[in-house]
């Protein structure tokens, strides 16, 4: 069956993004994946959008995705501690005013504490950034992980492996100083490194270090997770690619569809420490944005709604093939089959 969709919008959601792999498998099986020409995403949706932009098979996309070691993403120490830093840690532990807690703070947590004050985030995103660079490089002829491949490069098939044309990629970031979303794309930010834009888009406030960035034509600012302000950009393409009346029927053909996460509110999460508090704030922001979706029958009809069960979006203790990975993968596949079956009616 031929579907009307040309554009795909993906929601953010941390490790829930694994479910997009199951979604891709079903879209490919139905012939819908080949029709997608443009992708947009925030946070985890930006990561998946980048992978989908390569126009690989669902299996090859999963292979790239599975090379990510989720346990390394919340990275406490990016570089070896210098002697000066170790001395500062010992001096911190010796502070009588902080007793008894100061002596219990490890060197790793001390580094995180400094990062929180200096870079506005507990964890480093260096590992993730270098993983992104390696994945991007693998899709180019010269294949150099040290090179900064830009959005302009993504639009030049002659540079790509096998001269493969990529899908148009759009990434959502949040300019905290300007209080608004910023769009990264070949049209708006041709000279920006794609890996840097995706890193910005997944930088959950206070959980990961914020990114200092100068968006073209704007003052330098502090950038954080695009999902903070626009977690599910389902309407991103609507002005340029509006729905059209379906011939002979009293309904319209949508050019854009999307995938989002349906997380149960359930019982309150623990909030016993800073990390749990940050996780709760992030998930509260995502839930607040869900109100827009809940009051839009149109968006509901064109969305793959993936049930996440009791798996937390920041549950990084997950790896390919384990129980939670399989649950998310199957949740994405099941939701996609259900969505496509409704499209065929």
Feature locations, PLM:
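Gly/Ala-rich beta-loop-alpha elbow adjacent to hydrolase catalytic centers
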Residues: 41, 45
């Amino acid at each position: 069956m031929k579907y009307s969709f040309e554009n795909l919008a993906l929601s953010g959601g941390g490790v829930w993004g694994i479910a997009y792999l199951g979604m891709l498998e079903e879209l490919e099986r139905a012939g819908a994946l080949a029709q997608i020409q443009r992708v947009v995403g925030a946070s985890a949706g930006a990561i998946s959008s980048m992978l989908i932009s390569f126009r690989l098979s669902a299996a090859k996309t999963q292979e790239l995705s599975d090379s990510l070691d989720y346990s390394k993403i919340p990275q406490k120490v990016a570089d070896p501690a210098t002697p000066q830093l170790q001395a500062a840690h010992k001096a911190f532990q010796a502070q009588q005013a902080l007793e008894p807690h100061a002596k219990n703070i490890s060197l790793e947590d001390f580094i995180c504490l400094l990062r929180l004050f200096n870079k506005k985030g507990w964890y480093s995103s260096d590992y993730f950034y270098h993983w992104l660079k390696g994945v991007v490089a693998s899709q180019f002829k010269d294949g150099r992980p040290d090179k900064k491949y830009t959005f302009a490069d993504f639009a030049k098939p002659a540079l790509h492996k096998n001269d493969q044309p990529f899908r148009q990629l759009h990434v959502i970031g949040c300019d905290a100083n300007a209080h608004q979303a910023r769009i990264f794309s070949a049209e708006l930010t041709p000279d920006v490194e794609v890996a840097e834009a995706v890193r910005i888009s997944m930088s959950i406030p206070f959980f990961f270090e914020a990114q200092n960035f100068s968006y073209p034509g704007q003052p330098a600012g502090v950038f954080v997770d695009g999902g903070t302000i626009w977690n599910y950009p389902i309407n991103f393409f609507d002005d340029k690619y509006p729905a059209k009346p379906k011939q002979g029927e009293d309904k319209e053909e949508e050019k854009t569809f999307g995938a989002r996460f349906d997380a149960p509110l359930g019982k309150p999460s623990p909030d016993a420490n800073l990390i749990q508090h940050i996780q709760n704030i992030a998930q509260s922001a995502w839930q607040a944005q869900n109100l827009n979706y809940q009051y839009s029958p149109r968006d509901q009809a064109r969305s793959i709604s993936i049930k996440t069960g009791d798996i937390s979006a920041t549950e990084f203790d997950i790896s390919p093939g384990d129980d939670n990975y399989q649950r998310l993968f199957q949740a994405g596949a099941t939701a996609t089959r259900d969505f496509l079956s409704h499209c065929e009616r």
